[in-house]
A protein has these predicted regions:
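N-terminal Rossmann-like NAD(P)+-binding subdomain of aldehyde/semialdehyde dehydrogenases
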Residues: 1-109
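Conserved small-residue-rich beta-alpha loop and adjacent elements
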Residues: 96-167
Length: 168
């Protein structure tokens, strides 16, 4: 059975997905994923992913500028292209189709289900691109995600996480 990380974490409120401790973030992600799995159908996930994509596209240049300025890595123009690539091309719910396989031994049905809370790290080289890609993939699958961001990109990652949480 699940045991909460801490009693305090049960009532903690993050700042649009940003928390003071990893325990608080994991607890919030666990509770959010359970509610997400129980209360959101595939079409609801599609709506959320669409909102994330639209919001990200509006902020692609800002994300690129913040990333280059904070990390000192990469080229602004390339960061815009990379952000747009993950926003427009990361597979979403369209990959989650039920398959039926029949053969001599009977029928097998393959249906994807959520894993739960997923932990992810972000590299300093592509912090916002990684967050966007992972969020689209993981939310499409009915999961939640907790990011441990690279310290040299923490402000741009904070902005990206909060932007995404505001979009949904």
């Amino acid at each position: 059975p699940y045991v909460p990380v801490s009693a305090a974490a049960q009532t903690v409120q993050g700042d649009y997905g940003v928390f003071d401790t990893m325990d608080q973030a994991v607890e919030a992600a666990y509770l959010a994923q359970k509610a997400y799995q129980a209360g959101f159908q595939l079409r609801d996930r599609e709506r959320l992913i669409k909102s994330i994509r639209e919001t990200g596209i509006k902020n692609a240049e800002k994300l690129a500028r913040m990333s280059v300025d904070e990390t000192g890595l990469g080229r602004y123009e390339d960061k815009i292209l990379k952000n747009m690539l993950v926003l427009e091309r990361t597979p979403g719910t369209e990959c989650l189709r039920t398959e039926a396989i029949s053969g001599d031994d009977g029928l097998t049905i393959v249906e994807h289900s959520p894993y739960g809370v997923i932990g992810a790290i972000t590299p300093v080289t592509n912090p916002t691109e990684t967050i966007i890609n992972n969020v689209i993939s993981m939310l499409s699958g009915g999961n939640s995600v907790v990011f441990n961001v690279h310290p040299s990109a923490k402000e741009v990652c904070r902005f990206a996480v909060q932007m995404i949480n505001r979009a949904i």
